[in-house]
Amino acid sequence: MKAIRVHEFGDPEVLQLDEVADLTPGPGQVVVRMHAAGVNPVETYIRSGIYPKPPTPYTPGSDGAGAVEAVGGGVSRVAVGDRVYIAGSLSGTYAEQALCTENQVHSLAERAAFAQGAAIFVPYATAYQALFHCGHAAPGETLFVHGASGGVGIAGVQLARAAGMTVIGTASTERGRQLVAEQGAQHVVDHSAPSYLEEAKTLAGEYGVDVILEMLANVNLGKDIDLLAMRGRVVVIGNRGEKNQGTVEINPRAAMMRDASIIGMTLRNATPQDLVRIHASLVTGLANGTLQPVIGQEFPLAEAAQAHRAVSGEKAYGKVVLVP
């Protein structure tokens, strides 16, 4: 089979298309014939060497969707031919096949395209964990989403609207703002405008914003507290810059006066119990149509380098996927 592998860390060009042996499942394992693989920003950080480095060569990717091709002994949750989305993989998903444990594959509704299945796990699980497990979001509250036209941003908007929240989202392009509005955000602002935070504050009303999903903390975090309502929460999902280059200053007194919380999160810290709740929500949302991942760009597997450049761009629009 063909697979993208990283033999050394560096720029996107290190993503190399290799011919490797087909995969065989062991006990409790499943081989999935890949129809689409999701591309996430974290994979660009690992590839470049600024995150913990896996042994090389390795195949990137933890998101994907396809059909079960083979199962190992003891597998009972899925059968050959089942449509599934992948939430983690033993072998990586930038490939024609992926090896997974039985618990890493989940039912993909017939109404969802494979590309949408490849776009569900990391963005939607991250948004769910940030909103409900870390941010303790509740119906009737107001959510502010920085960069709402990207994969996690869209997920946050859809999940929040389904939960009965008021949503204010940002995007820097007209196309992006239209997309955010189409996902159900009641208010959308242009975060390239100098006064966009003042506009957001006005839209939030006298009480302010209850929860902020922060995708670019090194740029925005110092200003976020001024938007918060009493006991408001900022959940930090993203921060760019190598090691200590992403530091910011905040006003502790502003946080004190609001009883505000700043909460960092990463999906890798989700507990098994968290993941059970997350996947129950995702499977149901895909089946009933309340969750509809938006695909921004599709690339052939051989163009993984271009896909990494696209997902690293500043003007996010939907999810980037690879098609083997």
Model segments located where?
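Short, glycine/polar-rich helix-capping loops at beta-to-alpha or helix-loop-helix junctions
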Residues: 93-95, 172-179, 246-252
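Adenosine-nucleotide cofactor-binding segment
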Residues: 161-223, 273, 280
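Glycine-rich phosphate-binding loop and adjacent beta-alpha segment
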Residues: 219-291, 324
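NAD(P)H dinucleotide-binding glycine-rich loop of Rossmann-like/cofactor-binding domains
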Residues: 77, 86-147
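Mid-domain Rossmann-like dinucleotide-binding core that forms the NAD(H)/NADP(H) cofactor-binding site
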Residues: 120-194
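C-terminal hydrophobic helical "lid"/dimerization subdomain
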Residues: 1, 273-324
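Short glycine-centered segments of the SAM/dcSAM-binding site in methyltransferase folds
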Residues: 83, 142, 166, 232-233, ...
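Glycine-rich beta-strand-centered segment in the early N-terminal region that forms part
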Residues: 21-38, 48-92, 215
